Amino acid sequence: GPSMPTMFDLVGERPQMVDVDGQGLIQPVDAKGIGVLSIGFFTDQDNAVVWRGPMASKALTQLFTDAHWGELDFLLVDLPPGTGDIHLSLVQTVPLDGVVIVSTPQEVALADARRGINMFQMDTLKVPVIGVVENMAWFTPAELPENKYYIFGRDGAKNLANGMNVPFLGSIPLVQSVCEAGDAGRPAVYQENTPTALAFDELVHTFVDELTKLKAKTL
């Protein structure tokens, strides 16, 4: 999304063009060893990106076909919620290993997550759902680090995953440090030995385990 330059502390950076076998390709911007490409690099930070579905889909496709990603461990694509043109274009353009569904616990958000799972599992798409992540699962104030307040309900995404027979990957708490880290361009995972960093670390390990099992089934 267009906010990625801010979240990776890359505001003002611009991807460079590189020559690869006689073809000019976009070189992703490096952020501590992570290659990043975003529409936000090509638009003014304060201007709205008002594109119809086909134009947005074309732009997404170009971030794959016109970029020099090189050797990667993982290529992650952050998509907006919904079941529209962008999602279909991605499925039709890129051979995906799977998708991760992220939802907050309340029913109004779970309804979108449920539709997303159903879309990717359609016979015409058949994209594996690696699992579900519950974001903003609980609130923990800094002065009461042992307390959990379930502002948006409890275990909504976990129950959704169990009910739809897909893996549950983990929960991310609602804490001020995540907001501050995103605004400052310092990912929360860099906060050593904090509940937030530990939650992300556990989530990543579970994600890799589930993806490994999923790929083993297709061999």
Segments predicted by a language model, with ranges:
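Loop/turn-to-beta-strand initiation segments
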Residues: 32-35, 70-75, 98
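C-terminal boundary of histidine-terminating zinc-finger modules
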Residues: 182-196
